[in-house]
């Protein structure tokens, strides 16, 4: 059988030969770069690809945990060109993110982020410095402050009512929860970022879904960044560039329309109709923000809006889906959570933001779920800014630092019966997931902790409470709880391999 039909002097062969020789050269150069440095221990590296073969085709967080069991909580891997330091314990994560926090405050610059976030603008991928500090301050004090999140309760409750009505219409029929949640989350995020009147919402959602899909795998283009031709040959650059053109057209129109409306009559504040994140950002663009010295551009605004829509959807839906999965497998927990919600709400027509503080057991369910099923088992990587020493070992500049939070979440040294779903372990416990307790950091910690934790967890609590209040749930086809698979699919986050399909019945207590 003919496998390759090109001659030895064909362009394809010459290109592959050049690529191979280049890889060998980089391997030799990379080996010399670390010569004489005591790196953390790790498995043997193959020429050119390093440890890449150990990551392909498996769930990376599980592979890395197994390797850490052998090589320790601070481990060195070579993944293509990239030097990676993998941290697999709570105390070492605290040491890296707190003690050496300033030295690991950068993010690696991925191909997707560079193109879709306007050269890595926004709070997630921007290099550490004055721009990022000022931007995170705007997030904390204005865009995602507790006061602002409370102001979005009306939007959340409105979109929840729409979702609940759609589920009620299909009571008794199997539904895929993931789809319903994404519809709610995209609608809520679009309204919170750019307002209720938004031409091009479908394009925003399409671009977010496409970008998430393209971020859902280890990309060869990012593992061999010095080979500039890879994004071109793979077609990734063309695909992203075309997607960005569609996104950019919509966002420019939205920004232009709003800016004209806000400032054409010498207005200095958004009207009531315009109280969303875009209105706040436009004040900063026009020198009318709280910090009048900090100015931003249209590209900053577009990156921030798109980043918020991206970050606020898949992680929240994944958390709720895993919560529901665990409660279906543990009927005792489901009943206890439903009883709490229905007791707190009593005869109310719907769940509201003001009810959430009283739902103590529901919060325990969420904590336990993100412990076992974190939305990002491997926290967003950090990039080392300068060499530093840790336990007598050198953590080299430009290395990626990867926190395997999933390994921390099931560490038997921290958690009793670590792999069991037991929300009561958080009863009367001070542990929260806001970055101070390193045994529970699903949203990161330190200088790059997720700035949208409150907004995201509010959506999660509202979704989960609504499902528990309005409906009773069972598996389709007479399936028993213990038969539900809990297989994972690793991508931009960690979701169920098979989306959760349940049959809702309308609860008398919640209606």
Swiss-Prot record:
What tissues harbor this protein? Answer: Mainly expressed in roots and, to a lower level, in leaves.
Q: Does the keyword Cytoplasm apply?
A: no
Q: Which cofactor does it need?
A: heme
Its record classes its membrane topology as:
Single-pass type II membrane protein
Q: What is its EC number?
A: 1.14.14.-
Highest rank taxon of the organism: Eukaryota
Major place of localization? endoplasmic reticulum
Record's subcellular location:
Endoplasmic reticulum membrane
State the reactions this protein catalyses. Answer: (19E)-geissoschizine + reduced [NADPH--hemoprotein reductase] + O2 = polyneuridine aldehyde + oxidized [NADPH--hemoprotein reductase] + 2 H2O + H(+); tetrahydroalstonine + A + reduced [NADPH--hemoprotein reductase] + O2 = alstonine + AH2 + oxidized [NADPH--hemoprotein reductase] + 2 H2O + H(+); ajmalicine + A + reduced [NADPH--hemoprotein reductase] + O2 = serpentine + AH2 + oxidized [NADPH--hemoprotein reductase] + 2 H2O + H(+)
Pathway per the UniProt entry: Alkaloid biosynthesis; ajmaline biosynthesis
Q: Which residues bind heme?
A: 450
Q: Does the keyword Heme apply?
A: yes
Transmembrane stretches, start-end: 6-26
Q: How is it used?
A: The strictosidine aglycone-producing AJM7-DeltaHYS yeast strain expressing pathway genes of the VOM module, RsGS, SBE (GsSBE, RsSBE1 or RsSBE2), RsPNAE, RsVS and RsVH, accumulates vomilenine. Additionnal expression of pathway genes of the AJM module, RsVR, RsDHVR, AAE (RsAAE1 or RsAAE2) and RsNNMT, leads to the production of ajmaline. Ajmaline is an anti-arrhythmic alkaloid commercially used as an efficient drug for the treatment of arrhythmic heart disorder.
Ordered alphabetically, the record's keywords are:
Endoplasmic reticulum, Heme, Iron, Membrane, Metal-binding, Oxidoreductase, Signal-anchor, Transmembrane, Transmembrane helix
Q: Please explain the role this protein plays, according to its UniProt record.
A: Monooxygenase involved in the biosynthesis of ajmaline-type monoterpenoid indole alkaloids (MIAs) natural products, important plant-derived pharmaceuticals used in the therapy of heart disorders. Converts by cyclization the strictosidine-derived geissoschizine to the sarpagan alkaloid polyneuridine aldehyde, precursor of vomilenine, an intermediate chemical in the biosynthesis of ajmaline. Converts by aromatization the tetrahydro-beta-carboline alkaloids tetrahydroalstonine and ajmalicine to the corresponding beta-carboline alkaloids alstonine and serpentine, respectively.
- Family stated for the protein in its record: Belongs to the cytochrome P450 family.
Tell me what this protein is called: Sarpagan bridge enzyme 2
């Amino acid at each position: 059988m003919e496998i390759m039909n090109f001659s030895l002097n064909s362009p394809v062969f010459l290109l592959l030969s050049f690529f191979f020789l280049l890889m060998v050269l980089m391997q030799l150069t990379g080996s010399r770069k670390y010569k004489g440095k005591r790196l953390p221990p790790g498995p043997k590296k193959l020429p050119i690809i390093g440890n890449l073969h150990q990551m392909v085709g498996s769930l990376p967080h599980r592979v890395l945990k197994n390797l850490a069991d052998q090589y320790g909580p601070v481990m060195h891997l070579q993944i293509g060109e990239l030097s990676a330091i993998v941290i697999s314990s709570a105390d070492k994560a605290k040491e890296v993110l707190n003690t050496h926090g300033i030295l690991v405050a950068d993010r690696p610059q991925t191909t997707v982020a560079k193109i879709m976030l306007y050269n890595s603008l926004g709070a997630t991928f921007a290099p550490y410095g004055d721009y990022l500090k000022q931007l995170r301050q705007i997030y904390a004090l204005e865009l995602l402050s507790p006061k602002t999140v409370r102001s979005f309760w009306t939007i959340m409750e409105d979109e929840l009512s729409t979702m609940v009505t759609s589920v009620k219409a299909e009571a008794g029929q199997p539904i895929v929860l993931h789809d319903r949640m994404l519809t709610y989350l995209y609608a809520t995020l679009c309204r919170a970022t750019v307002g209720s009147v938004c031409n091009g919402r479908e394009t925003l959602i399409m671009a977010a879904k496409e970008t998430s899909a393209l971020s859902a795998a280890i990309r060869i283009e990012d593992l061999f960044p010095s080979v500039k031709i890879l994004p071109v040959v793979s077609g990734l650059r063309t695909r992203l560039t075309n997607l960005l053109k569609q996104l950019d057209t919509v966002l420019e129109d939205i920004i232009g329309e709003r800016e004209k409306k806000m400032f054409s009559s010498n207005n200095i504040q958004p009207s009531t109709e315009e109280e969303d994140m875009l209105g706040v950002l436009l004040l900063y663009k026009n020198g009318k923000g709280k910090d009048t010295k900090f100015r931003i551009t249209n590209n900053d605004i577009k990156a921030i809006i798109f980043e918020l829509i991206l970050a606020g959807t898949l992680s929240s839906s994944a958390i709720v889906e895993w919560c529901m999965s665990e409660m279906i497998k543990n009927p005792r927990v489901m009943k206890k959570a439903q009883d709490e919600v229905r007791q707190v709400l009593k005869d109310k027509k719907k769940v509201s933001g003001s009810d959430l503080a009283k739902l103590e057991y529901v919060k325990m369910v969420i904590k336990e779920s993100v412990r076992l099923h974190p939305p990002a088992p491997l926290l967003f990587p950090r990039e080392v800014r300068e060499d530093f020493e840790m336990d007598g070992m050198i953590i080299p500049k430009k290395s990626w630092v990867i926190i395997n939070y999933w390994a921390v979440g099931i560490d038997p040294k921290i958690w009793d019966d670590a792999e069991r779903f037991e929300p009561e372990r958080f009863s009367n416990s001070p542990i929260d997931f806001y970055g101070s307790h390193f045994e529970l950091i699903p949203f990161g910690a330190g200088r790059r902790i997720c700035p949208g934790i409150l907004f995201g967890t509010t959506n999660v609590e509202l979704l989960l409470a609504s499902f528990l209040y309005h409906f009773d749930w069972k598996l389709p086809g007479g399936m028993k709880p213990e038969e539900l698979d809990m297989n994972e699919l690793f991508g931009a986050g960690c979701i169920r391999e098979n989306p959760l399909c349940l049959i809702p019945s309308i609860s008398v207590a919640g209606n």
